[in-house]
Amino acid sequence: MYLKKIFNNKKIVVTGHTGFKVSWLTAWLKLLGANVMGISLNPPTHPSHFLVSKINIGIKDIRLDIRDRKKLEKKFIAFKPNFVFHLAAQPLVGLSYKDPITTWQTNVFGTLNVLESLRKLKNACNVVIITSDKCYFNKEIIFGYKERSEERRVGKECRSRW
């Protein structure tokens, strides 16, 4: 299997690994033989796919808010990942209206914290940053503007630093 050759025995950070979709990604990477470190808040639902499927077994399961740049940097530097899949976010549209500051801090500045943590690494690292379909300037839903902001910021960071 081609993907097994890529990910087997590689160190991979997955942010947001306790969420439903990302827990599936984490399980898949484990099956491919990756050494996974998941960084996330507690599972968002009870029961959760993450806990029921016991995805936490056999990975480094870290509870950490991506808004905490210093702690995030320490984890990245100590782990020395070969790959990072960044999917941690505050994904709920309703909550983004109730608490826009936390949503922006998590989704935009959290992504910047991941990028800064990558920049501190001494080793080469591949990164995949996944946001949502809302980043395509959905003018009916204001929520999408923060995703688009995140997409633009990532592009600027990549062009200016790498």
Describe these PLM feature segments:
Residues 1-156:
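N-terminal Rossmann-like NAD(P)+-binding domain of SDR-like oxidoreductases, especially those catalyzing
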Residues 157-162:
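Hydrophobic alpha-helical segments, chiefly the membrane-spanning helices
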